[in-house]
Amino acid sequence: NMIIDCNEVRKKILDDVKEEVGKLPTTPKMAIVTCSYDEPSQIYVKNKVKTAGEVGIEAVHFNLDPKMFYDTDELADYVKRLNQQYHSIIVQLPLHEKFNEKQVLEMIDPLHDVDGLTNENIAKLVQNDPRAIVPATAQASFEIIKHDVGRSDLSELNVTIINRSHLIGKPLFQLLTNHNATVTVCHSRTADLH
C-alpha cells in the first residue's frame, strides 16, 4: 500500500492555471448553478468559488430554489441563457429530483462545460480527442497517477478504480485506458471486494 501526497500536484496545477489565467485579456467568469436542497452541494460550491478566486477566475453562485421553475424546460432555458454571459458553467449535481439532469446539462455550450458532462465532451473523451473537457476529480486523479509514476504513457500499469460514477470512475477509466493503462473497475455490486 502506498500513500501519495497530493498537495504538491494540487499546488502545481493551481499555479499553472493562475499563470494561464493571468495571460488572458479579460477576467474569466464562471457561473455555478445549484437547484436543489442538497446541503453538501453548498459546501462543494463554496470551495469551488474560493479556489476559482485564488486562480483569478470570477465565480458567481446562482443558488436557485427548485420552486422557481415549473419544470426541466424552464431550468434548462435558464442555464442556456448563462452561456451568453459567462465563459464557463457548472451545474452542481444533484439537481432537485423533479428535474432531468441530462437535459439541463445539455444546455451548456460544450466549450463552457467545466465538468465535461455534455454529450459532446463525453464523446471527445471516449475518442481520445485532446479537446475533451474532463471532470475535475477524474482529471486530478489522472494527474496524480502520472506524477507518481513519472510518465504519461501508462503502459504496463495495472489500476483498479473503485467507482463507476459519471463524474469520477467512468472518465478516469477512459483517461487511463487512453494512456495505455490496464484498468479494472469495481463498484458497490462487485462481489468479494477486499
Question: PLM features: what roles do these ranges have?
Answer:
Residues 90-154, 172:
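Anion-binding alpha/beta catalytic cores of soluble intermediary-metabolism enzymes, centered on
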Residues 35-37, 64-66, 94-96, 122, ...:
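Short, ordered loop/turn segments at secondary-structure junctions
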Residues 54, 81, 108-111:
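Non-catalytic terminal and connector segments of soluble metabolic enzymes
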Residues 1-26:
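Positively charged, low-complexity intrinsically disordered leader regions
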Residues 73-85:
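Short, well-structured alpha-helical segments in soluble
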Residues 37-49, 132-194:
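Glycine-rich phosphate/diphosphate-binding loop of Rossmann-like nucleotide-binding domains
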Residues 52-67, 183-186:
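Short beta-strand elements in bilobed, periplasmic/extracellular small-molecule ligand-binding domains
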Residues 27-37:
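Short beta-strand segments enriched in small/hydrophobic residues
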